[in-house]
Amino acid sequence: MKTRFSVVACLIAICAAAQSSSPYASEAGKAAVEHVLRTQQDAWNRHDLDGFMAGYWNSPELTFFSGGQEQHGWQATLDRYRARYASPGHEMGKLEFSALRIEMLGSDAAFVRGEFHLTMPDGKTPHGLFTLVFRKFVDGWKIVHDHTSAAE
């Protein structure tokens, strides 16, 4: 009985060790996720909405929560951004992400908290908080869920 218990305990320990990420993998994942966000920020500041959207999972399963509304799908999210920031009478402004806290949930998932700040041509400065869920796909890290809330 003791032998069986020892074997089972060893197998559990081996499986747990195999599933845990190395510190390097965790740091590499965090850097890759931050790179996606910086690439999005740069694309936004070039008024490149398609480049900004490249950071999102191009799937009907993408979810976006903001302003008390729930949006589903990459195309619907793009349409929302276009209507609010890239249509006549609406400007994209300059975007800055700050206070990023990236937590790896595994080797292929991450949770991000942060702040956004927009500086608009008319001098207004919308800002707020966001939480993001990232997943790692064959083509890289993508946002699969975005919850953004603007400050009042």
Language model features: what each stretch is:
Residues 1-8:
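Bacterial N-terminal signal peptides that target proteins for export
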Residues 57, 68, 101, 114-116, ...:
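A mature extracytoplasmic/lumenal domain signature
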Residues 55, 61-72, 86-90:
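A short gly/proline-enriched turn/hairpin at secondary-structure junctions
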Residues 76-122:
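Surface-exposed, charged secondary-structure patches
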Residues 127-152:
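Short beta-strand edge/turn micro-motifs at domain boundaries
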Residues 13-55:
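Short, low-complexity N-terminal intrinsically disordered segments enriched in polar/charged residues
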Residues 40, 52-53, 61-62, 73, ...:
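Hydrophobic pocket/interface hotspot
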